[in-house]
Amino acid sequence: MKAPPGRRRRAARPPARTHRTTLAFDSTGTARLGIIPRHGRVVTEFADLTQRGASAARIGNRTLTPADLVAVVADCLIADARDDLHDDPAGITLTHPVGYSDQQVGELRAALDAAGLQRVTLVAEPVAAAAWLEAEHGPLMPGLALVYDLGGASLDVTLVRVGAGCPDNPVMGTLRSRDFGGRAFGALMTARAVHGRSGGEPGGSPAPDLAGELRGEHVRESLELVYRCLRLADVTMADVDRVLVVGGAARPAEVARVLGEELARPIVIAADPERTIATGAALMARRAAASAAPAEPVSAARPWVFSRRGARRSARVAAAAAVSAGAIGLTLAVPGDAVFAALSQLGVG
């Protein structure tokens, strides 16, 4: 189907699957994603490699680092997204927080390779978000977009170059604060309710209108992080063409409304902002798979496997072709979000 004259056809929206960011291992060492069994150990709080004291796990005679656990989850999700991925190879992109150091990205890359996932591409979250922006609202003129990622456990503000001619690394500056997000706002609401400042009885739930007012205040207070990010990149708000709002805590209407009023720039937000990054990752994977040349089989060390179908798949991973009829984008939320989202886009073009 062709788009109407003067309008660009939007990219098809990939179907989504979401899971809790938890891993349980049975007696055979097989990983179970997103479940909390009645008996046995559950591993949580491993998703953010920047978090001090992030969980590790010992399975059999192997100790799994947080990066290893992320690779296990990615392997489980890939198996879940496609019934037999390695019989019908697809492009795969896994996003990571933009604030990861080179060492942390290297640890994640090494863990994926050890799990037999050498063809998974790593990309920073705001770069994937910008890919969604280009697909939904492009073609974009060369310029700057500010990605306001309000998640469950933190707020990430990132300046990204968009449009034709942007460099391989389009990120100009980024800052993170754990003082904002779903968890911080929930604590604020609880404090107001406990101290009887909700307009109702002490200990009661805050009234809906006050909840919206508090959320607006929460967003306004976060603007200092936005301005600090602008100063870091040596630009002003006048240099920013649009603000892209993403993240699971960005869904309430007050978030986009307050940002639009205070920043005086066009606000772009998807109907489901928690999916924006994963959708962008899937679109990037599809483009990469469509443009790649067939890969030659390579020999590799036997991968360690913990997913339920890993033994069947790992024998085929080295011979998988790079040209694909589909794509998968994976994004891992920080602990406060507690979800790992996988999206599969079937069909290239």
Segments and roles (model prediction):
Residues 1-15, 19-21, 26, 135-171:
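Gly/Thr-rich phosphate-binding beta-strand-loop-beta motif of the actin/hexokinase/Hsp70
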Residues 2-93, 222-226:
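Conserved phosphate-binding loops in N-terminal lobes of ATP-dependent enzymes
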Residues 21-23, 162-206, 210, 328-332:
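Glycine-rich phosphate-binding loop plus the immediately following alpha-helix
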Residues 72-84, 133, 216-239, 252-258, ...:
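Phosphate/ATP-binding catalytic cores across multiple sugar-kinase/actin-like superfamilies
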Residues 94-104, 214-218, 235-260, 273-277:
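Glycine-rich phosphate-binding loops at beta-strand->alpha-helix junctions
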Residues 117-148, 278-290:
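Conserved phosphate-binding catalytic cores of ATP/NTP-utilizing and phosphoryl-transfer enzymes
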Residues 261, 266-268, 275-303:
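N-terminal intrinsically disordered, acidic low-complexity segments at the extreme N-terminus
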Residues 287-349:
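Acidic, glycine/GT-rich loop-and beta-edge segments that sit at the periphery of enzyme/chaperone cores
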